[in-house]
Structures are given as C-alpha cells and as structure tokens.
Amino acid sequence: QRQMCIRDSYQAQRGIPGYRQMKIILERRYGLKCNLKRIYRLMRVLGLRSVCRKKKRRYQKKTPAEYTAENILNREFSSDRQNEKCVADITELKYGSGSKAYLSAVLDLYGRNIVAFSLSRRNNTPLVLDTFEQAFQKYPDAKPLLHSDRGVQYTSRSFRKEMKRAGVCQSMSRVGRCLDNAPMEGFWGILKTEMYYLYHFEDYETLRKTICAYIDFYNNDRYQKKLGCMTPAEFIAASAK
C-alpha cells in the first residue's frame, strides 16, 4: 500500500517530492505513518528521486542607491500574525533562445505564502511597484515591515515614496549578506527546483502560465514542515479561527 501511495503521489506532483516531502504527503493524505529512512528506502526501490537543485551565482550591477534602510528585520524571520513582516526579491528566468524575464514576489513570513507576484521582460522599478500594487489591493490596510535587498528597484525614490505613502517601513539586507533575506532566497530555490528546471519554456506566455500555476500550487497544496505540515492556505485559515 505504501509503495502504491508513494508512486501515485510522485506521479501526481510530477516527480517533485523528495522523501521528506513524501513523508508529509503520506501522513496528510493517506494517514500512513512511516519514518524517513523507510520512505527513503522505498523510493530508492521504486527508482524515484526528486529533482536535484541547481545552484547558480547571481551577479548584479552596482547602481548608486537613492535611498537605503537599516537591516531592521535582522534575520528575525518568525512572525506572530499575517501582514506583520514581508520579504521581497526579484529573480531572473530564461525562455526561448536565452531571452530573459524577471519575477518579482512578496512573501509573508507568517503563513510563508506568496502574497503577490509579477513577471516582466524588464527588471525595473515598475516591476516591483506592480507587485506591491497587487499586494495592497488584497490587503489595503496592511502596513508590514518590508525587507528586501539593496537592489536599485527597492532603493529608488519612486518606490520609497510609494512605501511611505502606504505606511510601510522598509528594511534592507546588508551588502553581500544574502542570508539576511533567507526565506525569499529559499522560495526561489524551491520554485526553480520544483518547476523552472523541469521544463524548457519556448515563449514568455508559457513561462508566465506555468509560474501562475506553480504559485497557486505552492500556496494551496504544498505542505510545509515549518507550518505544522500544513499548506500556507491551511495555516492562515486555521489561525483565523
């Protein structure tokens, strides 16, 4: 029975789950208790393994910042309520024959959910402004602490003006300290491992649709151990009761 459940779950999620994620799936969906070593062994017997993560160095052009903020978040990634602390970042993706697209996202540290995201062919301030416009439409009264790196998009005068108007306090990573924004970096790693590296995207629209589908899956169907083996949507709903 366990082997059948493992195989079905693996196929249903396109080979994404490793043995740790599979343990949560077996417990949540099938009520099957099994230790990690046994699941690891069963997956090896079945010839099932998750996609291996590829690591890629990121290089950014240094642009004089119009505004910078202190590292107020200071790696305090726990949160007691929704819309208390959010982190944001941009990552580069490719499609076609090397064309570039840029994905901007905001993650809430309470439910570990993606609040808003935006994809563009240009890595500029309008990209992040569009992302936050979506976030404010969902939560018009939210005034979170917002943490980001010191990219030119987040240090621009126009972005600072918009955050000030919305009553949002900015926090920024120290120079060269990517771990200051570890939850966002972690999300990019998950998205690329479980979605981006699995396919070759022929065009921009295919990339956009696949990202939309994956983030919906991430928010509503992907269990997280840090959330008590619940999905972000389940965790937020449970906390509201």
Listing of model-derived features with the role each one plays in the protein:
Residues 108-109, 119-124:
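A short acidic/small-residue loop/turn micro-motif
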Residues 19-31:
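DNA-recognition alpha helix
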Residues 1-6:
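Short, small-residue-biased leader/transition segments that mark boundaries at the very start
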Residues 15, 31, 78, 96, ...:
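Conserved, non-catalytic sequence blocks in retroelement Pol enzymes and Pol-derived host proteins
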Residues 62-63, 148-150, 156-159, 172-192, ...:
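RNase H-like two-metal-ion nuclease catalytic core shared by retroviral integrases
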Residues 32-105, 127-130, 138-143:
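Mobile-element integrase/transposase regions
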Residues 164-168, 190-241:
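C-terminal domain-tail junction helix/linker
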